[in-house]
């Protein structure tokens, strides 16, 4: 028998009558992600998705790494199926896990008997296989509390499966089951992390980025596209809509008080993101805002910036410390790109003393000096859409 991948389901098992649609979507996502590594048979049984190679040329290691990044899988392991007999299970464990068993000093066997027709109980099977392994490998001691290695045996309806400890996978919900949203993507640390966290809840994303040439460089643009590409293993295929923002920022600088520059700029960003979301039939906006992290992210300022939207604004980072955000950025592979020293439009015309407790009435009054509708229409008319090539 060939080695296979076992993908353990997370929240999907709690979905009741909708569970099957979540499983089908998850299997579709796994199929898409494993396609570059060969032909695999993908099916679901007993709260586990099986990824089984059809050809000897399949890259099982590559498929395993890809599956670890698929949302909806809580744990993952490579396993070897065998005949459902205690002798076959022992032989498989001894050969398949030979390297780990040789390296370990202590071990235990943990069995699960999903097939209740199997003649031995779970504890009996663990004791028998553990005893046989101990006899075959005398250097091993049995430690049921703190073993260096746990040998797992799963007796299912179709076969028995032997594997070592499972690894944590991406968790969350299958991508595409949580709706469709527009995510505001800057060149910083926060917005890629917020995009990842919302995608983890099953939301398919479109990205919007605001560029202000000549104040922002071509390198800043390339940085954002690279960030989007680094998100594709988690978020799937992405389109980045680049909105020209120079005219809007220059008009704000000319006609609005300096302490309101950032706030009114944010309101324009939210307007434009809302317009794009409506056009694409998205149901929410996603930002990397974090309560109190900077002066423009007070509770009052957040309320003023979202005053111009027609749909929910999702802020997954709202209660995280910066250190927590950085940790996630490192985990998903965006941190090194985020800290490249290329300025984005958020750093253009930054006020010396931004307003921290603004009001909607003030913002609307200052915006009355601007041709809000005309500025937005011209920006949207001159936008650019770039489909980011996935890294998988």
Stretches with model-predicted labels:
Residues 188:
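Conserved G/P- and acidic residue-centered "switch" motifs that form tight phosphate/ATP-binding loops
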Residues 333-341:
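A short alpha-helix-loop-beta-strand transition element characteristic
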Residues 183, 207-209, 242, 287, ...:
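Structural beta-sheet core signal
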Residues 1-182, 192-238, 307, 355-360, ...:
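RNA-binding accessory domains that recognize and position tRNA/RNA substrates
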């Amino acid at each position: 028998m060939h080695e296979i991948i076992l993908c353990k389901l997370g929240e999907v098992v709690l979905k009741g009558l909708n569970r099957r649609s979540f499983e089908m979507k998850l299997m579709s996502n796994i199929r898409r992600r494993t396609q570059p590594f060969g032909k695999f048979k993908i099916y679901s049984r007993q709260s586990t998705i099986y990824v089984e190679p059809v050809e000897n040329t399949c890259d099982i290691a590559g498929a395993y790494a890809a599956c670890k990044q698929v949302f909806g899988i809580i744990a993952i392991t490579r396993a070897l199926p065998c005949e459902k007999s205690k002798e076959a299970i022992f032989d498989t464990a001894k050969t398949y896990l030979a390297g780990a068993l040789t390296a370990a000093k202590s071990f235990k066997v943990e069995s699960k008997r999903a097939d209740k027709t199997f003649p031995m109980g779970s504890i009996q099977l663990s004791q028998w296989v553990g005893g046989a392994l101990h006899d075959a490998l005398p250097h091993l001691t049995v430690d049921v509390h703190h073993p260096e290695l746990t040998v797992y045996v799963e007796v299912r309806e179709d076969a028995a499966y032997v594997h070592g400890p499972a690894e944590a996978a991406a968790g969350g919900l299958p991508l595409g089951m949580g709706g469709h949203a527009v995510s505001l993507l800057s060149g910083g640390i926060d917005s890629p992390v917020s995009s990842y966290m919302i995608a983890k809840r099953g939301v398919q994303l479109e990205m919007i980025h605001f560029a202000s040439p000549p104040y922002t460089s071509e390198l800043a643009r390339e940085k954002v596209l690279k960030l989007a590409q680094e998100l594709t293993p988690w978020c799937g295929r992405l389109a980045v809509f680049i909105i020209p923002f120079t005219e809007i920022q220059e008009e704000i600088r000319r006609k609005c008080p300096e302490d309101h520059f950032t706030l009114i700029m944010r309101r324009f960003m939210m307007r434009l993101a809302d317009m794009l979301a409506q056009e694409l039939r998205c149901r929410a906006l996603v930002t990397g805002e974090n309560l109190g992290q900077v002066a423009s992210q007070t509770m009052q300022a957040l309320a003023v910036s979202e005053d111009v939207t027609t749909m929910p604004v999702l802020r997954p980072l709202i209660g995280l410390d910066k250190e927590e955000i950085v940790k996630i950025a490192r985990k998903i592979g965006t941190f090194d790109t985020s800290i490249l020293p290329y300025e984005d439009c958020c750093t253009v015309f930054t006020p010396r003393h931004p307003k921290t407790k603004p009001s909607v009435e003030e913002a609307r009054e200052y915006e009355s000096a601007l041709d809000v509708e005309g500025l937005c229409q011209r920006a949207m008319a001159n936008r650019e859409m770039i489909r980011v090539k996935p890294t998988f």
